[in-house]
Structure formats: structure tokens, C-alpha cells
Amino acid sequence: QVTVGVYDPCNLSHYPGWPLRNFLVLAAHKWGDALQSIEVLCFRDRTMQGVRDITHSIIFEVELPGRALGPDCPKAVGWEKNQKGGMGPRMVNLSECMDPKRLLAESSVDLNLKLMCWRLVPTLDLEKSVSAKCLLLGAGTLGCSVARTLMGWGVRKITFVDNAKISYSNPVRQPLYEFEDCLSGGKPKALAAADRLQKIFPGVSSEGFHMSIPMPGHPVNFSEVTMAQARKDVAKLEELIDTHDVVFLLMDTRESRWLPAVIAASKRKLVINAALGFDTFVVMRHGLKKPKQQESGYSCSSNPSSSSDLLGTSLFSNIPGYKLGCYFCNDVVAPGDSTRDRTLDQQCTVSRPGLAMVAGALAVELMVSVLQHPEGGYAVASSSDDRMNEPPTSLGLVPHQIRGFLSRFDNVLPVSLAFDKCTACSAKVLDQYEQEGFNFLAKVFNSSHSFLEDLTGLTLLHQETQAAEV
């Protein structure tokens, strides 16, 4: 007597599963002349309420027919051609339906966004926002608010950069931190924020880098160690900006935004900037420079009123994205050390508690609106005058700046042109950076503000202004 065992996926009490058919045909073809019958054990294994059970397995005897199938074994049933064209069993990936992280987290997050498309905005391209890789420079009040809103839009790649540690005053204003994060000197903000995002939503890929960003007016030439560290920090920042699609500037001081603004302008990355006052804020997108091969014939110093790109009658209407100004374009002085003569209480950002959440949310919504526009960062800027016109995207306007005044509960949408003497995005600064790299940056860090002013022509502008006044 011959007994064979077969793993049986069927749960019926009196019948085996269909895979047994293939084996019975093979047995009849190979041993039909020698055996009249075989005993078959259909082994069934299941776990119910933590207890393993095989008592529902069945055993029975099968009579084998004589050799009546011919010399060739018939084709097996239940197999289909796979992606490579070969015959094999059809496999179905049920991980999304069985994995609680995917089922309850990713599917639910995606469902909320898809409902927007199905019910309200059918032309919304979610992939553009979900696939955006976002770099957050600053993990404080603004950084926490921006990160949470990015997750709401389904963004899967978020990276933090910050050099501070969590203090006892932070958790009440910065929602990614808890009281325990302040103990033992405080955890690094960037690392703690990245870890908290993973706990909030396991599907997000978040990283944190505890590092400083070199700044104009903050010398780094005290020793070879400080110079080497500055070079290392610059190289890391360049690498991070290069590997991300959108850069958020969310730091405390003005000068800390200069270096990432220069690097991002050189690498043609979309920059979203947010800054706070006590009851005012500004959220803006930096002008996105044209690709280098298309820049011939264009310069920031060209007369905007005579440009063929400006189709409107107003000087500030229909300005394309590559002619928009950056955070420093309205300055007539170079950035410097803004904390040198300030007391400790003056060095802290003091603003109304709800302001950061408003500005952070608008920063993310501005990013999404820009990405939804067919021209992306090169989209023509919308102004306050366009509020009654047909919006350029399914989500509405795509402004250059949003300036808010909480005391009046009012927002305005100004537009400003790129400044040919800008200390961050002008052609002279970008050319020097691209040609000399860190050597140029070191001069900016270690020199007074006059270095950038002399380079860009601001010093001459000051002299001409004084001469005109006289």
C-alpha cells in the first residue's frame, strides 16, 4: 500500500482542494500500471485563537486508472503565464489587505485624498504632491506645523535639519515634541521630529540631521577645526538640497536663510519661505531660475516693463516664475549677524501662538498649488487683483507672496520682481558660488556685510543715493 501526503488548502469537510488533481494525473501517468490505488492524506493546518489544529485533515483512498493518457503527460491545470511568459501558479499579493499598517494607515490616508478627487476636484494630480521630496530647514514651531500639513497631503519623504535641542518651552507650541523629550538636556529637534513622524504614520520616510547652517557675518575661521566643520556642513546641505524637490526655509534668523537660498537657486529647486513677526507673517515662493541652457539673453537687470513676458498693463501683472524675487530681493543691505547685540530675551522669536500654524499651513498649500500648476515653479504669479479672475489651477490662485496681518485678520498677495543686485539670487552671486564653491562662501561667512554689498553693487547704489540726496 502506498500513502502520499498533500498539503490541502481546502476547508470542506468531505472534499479535497483542486491542487490534488494535478498530482492524481501525474500518479496515474507514472504508476497506473503498477498500482491499482493509493491512499491520500490531505494535510490541513490552521491556527485558531492561538491554538494550532490539524484535526480537520482528511484521508481517503483513490483508484488509479490504467495507462490511458498516452506517452506524454497532460498539462497541469490552474497555471497561467506569468509576467515573464512562463507557466506558473497565479499569485495574488494580499499584503495591503492584511498588513494593519498599510490597511489602516496608508489606505486611510490615501482615501481622504482620493475623496477630494472623486467628489470635489477631479483634475487634482495627487501624485505630484505625494511624490514630492521635502526638505525642512528648521524643526521649530514652523517646522512642526509644516511637517504635519505635509503628511496630510500624503507626502512620504520629509527631512529635517536643525541644530537646536528641545527645551521645556517647546512642546506647548511645537506639536511634534513631548515633555519627555526635554529631559536630560533635551533631544536634538531634527532627530526627535523625524522619529515622531514615523510614530504618527509608519508609511512616511523621515530623516533628521542635527547640524548647523553657516551664515553671513558668523565667522568660521577661528581654527582649522571650525573651518573644516563649516566645509562639511556646506557639503551636506548641498547634498540634501540636491536630493530633494522642495526646500522649506523655516529658521529663526534672516541670515540663516541666505546659504540655502543661494544653493537652491543654483540647483533650480523650488523654495518655499515662511517667516513670522509678532502678529504678521510672510509666506512666499522664491523665483525659480531658468535652466542654464535657456538663460542666454535673460538677466535680472532687464527692464521688466519692456519684456514680452509681461502681458498685463501693470508693472506687476503676469510676472513669470523665473522673474520673481526671493526673500532677499527687497533688501538694500547684505545679511549679517542679527543676534550680536541682542539680549537673550530678544533672540527668541515672539509671536502670537496661532500664527505659526497659519503660516505653516499656507506654506504647504502654496507648495501644492505650485506643483499642481502645469508650469510648476515657473507659473505666473497671482496677486490680490486676481482674486475675482478665473483661477489658474483647480486649487485656485498661485501667488508669489502671502503677507498676513493677524491684528486685522487680513491677507494680501503682493508680487515683487527679482533684484539684479540681490545678495542671494542675483547672477553675480550665483556665478561666484558656482565658480569658487566653498572658497566664495567662506569669504561671505568671515567678512562683514560690505563684501556682498560690494560684489552685487549695493555699495555703489548707496553712494549714488547719497549723492542724489545732496
Model-derived features: where do they sit?
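Glycine-rich dinucleotide-binding loop and its adjacent helix/turn
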Residues: 105-128
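Glycine-rich adenosine-cofactor-binding loop
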Residues: 122-167
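Immunoglobulin-superfamily Ig-like beta-sandwich domains in protein ectodomains
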Residues: 112, 116, 166-168, 215-222
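Generic beta-strand/beta-sheet core signal
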Residues: 137, 153, 161-164, 209, ...
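Glycine-rich phosphate-binding loop and adjoining beta1-alpha1-beta2 segment
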Residues: 161-214
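Secondary-structure transition/capping motifs at alpha-helix termini
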Residues: 156-158, 200-204, 267-270, 322
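Glycine-rich phosphate/adenylate-binding loop
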Residues: 1-107, 133, 216, 224-470
